[in-house]
Regions:
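Pyridoxal 5′-phosphate
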Residues: 1-404
Length: 404
């Protein structure tokens, strides 16, 4: 049974007030709150096992190393990767995409080669490729979307050429909530011999992800959006691909031997993990993933889908309401505008009512241009949100709308 009262008690911040009002936190697409078990696990490691990993023969270092590598195993199991060697720790999704963009372009792309992305991408899956285009002369091709906010896959098929080297696509839109058909995208790309990178920042916290079932070649996500700490993320890569890619950064730990003439590199996954990792954060991430597993990803998905349907129904009763994104497969995100009210004004006034939402372009300016707007208000739901909080949002929007 999904006991929302018990779940909410795991998150102390949810009981606080803002401007004298109960906090209604609906900005989970930006970051999630952290359960006590995560905070306790990280504090316990700092108090009892704080030492650099993989470098010391002393007890604390070995204990910290064991926790760090156990976290890698937890991540591997959570996304059903085949091997711990396929799990690379990063600072987050953005660094993960930059890692693949840099290493893949260096190893496998020539001037004039092409990468395919989509019209709904977050800037973190646009700008890294633009940087590579400026440095290496690669070209970027874009899969368009229809008016429902869904990818036009037939148009994607037309983008493949003999120069296509990679497809890089988000699994879930952080603006529209669209859940993209990753398995079908991967199938079509593989027919052309093209690997696929998936941005899973907005999927991992919300529903079960199985990278072997998706058959994607690379997958990346962030800890802080999955109820874990900031500053830690994951790149999954098929081992055969990671073996072939050159390192992203150089430094300690990612080497086998170093001389002034030559450096040889460590085996996977350490080849991509230069320097001291945030070993306490990896332990926190593993604790968060264990928390999600204990609740059950299917249970979380059902709860959030119910919230999304209910919120959509209630918001649509407000005069002047415009919701952006009407995919038949939609995740826990609703972006909207009301009449001529600027999204910043609406979000600011909702904040005075204790309701935390996101306003602006959500790091997706090309998508906003496609929609013909400058930004939206975004309500994004998490495993601890309730229908009562949706009611508070709807009442708040009505109250603000009445002021204009």
């Amino acid at each position: 049974m999904y006991n929302i009262t018990s779940i909410r008690s795991d998150f102390p911040i949810l009981s606080r007030e803002v401007y004298g009002k109960p906090l209604v936190y609906l900005d989970n697409g930006a970051t999630t709150q952290k359960p006590l078990c995560v905070l306790d696990a990280m504090q316990h490691e700092y108090l009892n096992a704080n030492a650099n990993v993989h470098r010391g023969v002393h007890y604390l270092s070995q204990q910290a190393t064991d926790l760090h590598e156990a976290a890698r195993t937890t991540v591997r199991k959570f996304i059903n990767a085949r091997s711990d060697n396929e799990i690379i720790f990063t600072r987050g999704t953005t660094e993960g995409i930059n890692l693949i963009a840099s290493s893949f372009c260096e190893g496998f792309m020539q001037p004039g080669d092409e990468v395919i992305i989509t019209a709904m991408e977050h800037h973190s899956n646009i700008v890294p490729w633009q940087l590579q285009a400026a440095r290496s002369g690669i070209a970027i091709r874009v899969i368009p979307i229809d008016d429902r906010g869904e990818l036009i896959l037939d148009e994607m098929d037309k983008l493949f050429t003999s120069r296509t080297r990679l497809v890089s696509v988000m699994q879930v839109s952080n603006v529209l909530g669209t859940v993209n058909p990753i398995k079908e995208i991967v199938r079509r790309a593989h027919l052309h011999g093209v690997p696929v990178l998936v941005d899973g920042a907005q999927s991992v916290p919300h529903f079960k992800v199985d990278v072997q079932d998706l058959d994607c070649d690379f997958f990346t996500f962030s800890g802080h959006k999955a109820y874990g700490p900031t500053g830690v993320g994951v790149v999954y890569g098929k081992e055969e691909w990671l073996e072939k890619l050159p390192p992203y950064q150089g430094g300690g730990e990612m080497i086998a031997t170093v001389s002034f003439e030559k450096t040889t590199f460590a085996e996977l996954p350490f080849k991509f993990e230069a320097g001291t990792p945030d070993y306490v954060a990896t332990h926190g991430l593993a604790t968060a993933l264990d928390y999600l597993s204990a609740l059950g990803m299917d249970n979380i998905q059902r709860h959030e889908q119910d919230l999304t349907r209910y919120a959509t129904q209630q918001l649509e009763t407000i005069d002047g309401m415009r919701i952006f994104g009407h995919s038949t497969d939609k995740d826990a995100v609703i972006s909207f505008l009301v009449g001529d009210i600027h999204h910043l004004d609406l979000g600011t006034l909702l904040d005075r009512l204790g309701i935390a939402v996101r306003t602006g372009h959500h790091c997706a300016q090309p998508l906003m241009a496609r929609l013909g707007i400058s930004g939206t208000v975004r309500a994004s739901f998490g495993l601890y949100n309730t229908r009562e909080e949706i009611d508070a949002l709807v009442a708040g929007v009505r109250r603000v709308a009445a002021m204009f």
